[in-house]
């Protein structure tokens, strides 16, 4: 009996982690999930004109390895956990991101711990990204301008 209780307490955190988001339904190119999570990682905004023309203006987040476990992924989907915020203006204000960037720089990046609500997993095999709602952020580092990567 003691072994059973010990095993139950040891697996409880894993079960709780796996249930951060609960699948709701498919809509268009997205699988919709309900729930919330607190994640640590890197926020970013790319202002490179070519990128903006192709993908549009977005503020995105890449969770660190530990936090990535909270992001819903169907079996076999090995994409890096990465998403953008559906409430762009709130994210821009929260992270204090400017609308312009100096020459030879393409993006802003910083670190933060964020809380997100609901998750829309992009499932189409084309350009696009997952979307979620930014609820709050703390431990925010100031955004730093990142130089453009030169491609040869």
Across the structure, where does each feature detected by a protein language model lie?
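Structural detector for short beta-strands of small beta-barrel domains
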Residues: 25-69, 112-118
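Short, intrinsically disordered, charge-biased short linear motifs at domain edges
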Residues: 46-48, 70-72, 131-138
């Amino acid at each position: 009996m003691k072994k059973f209780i010990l095993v139950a307490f040891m697996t409880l955190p894993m079960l709780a982690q796996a249930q951060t988001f609960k699948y709701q339904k498919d809509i268009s190119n997205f699988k919709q999930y309900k729930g919330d999570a607190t994640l640590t990682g890197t926020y970013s905004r790319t202002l490179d004109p070519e990128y903006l023309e192709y993908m549009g203006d977005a503020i995105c987040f890449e969770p660190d390895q530990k936090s990535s476990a909270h992001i819903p992924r169907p079996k076999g989907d090995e994409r890096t956990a990465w998403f953008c915020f559906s409430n762009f203006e709130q994210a821009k204000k929260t992270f204090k991101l400017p609308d312009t960037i100096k020459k030879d720089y393409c993006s802003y990046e910083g670190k933060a711990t964020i809380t997100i609500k609901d998750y829309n997993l992009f499932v189409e095999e084309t350009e696009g990204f997952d979307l979620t709602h930014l609820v709050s952020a703390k431990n925010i580092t100031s955004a730093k301008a990142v130089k453009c990567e030169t491609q040869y």
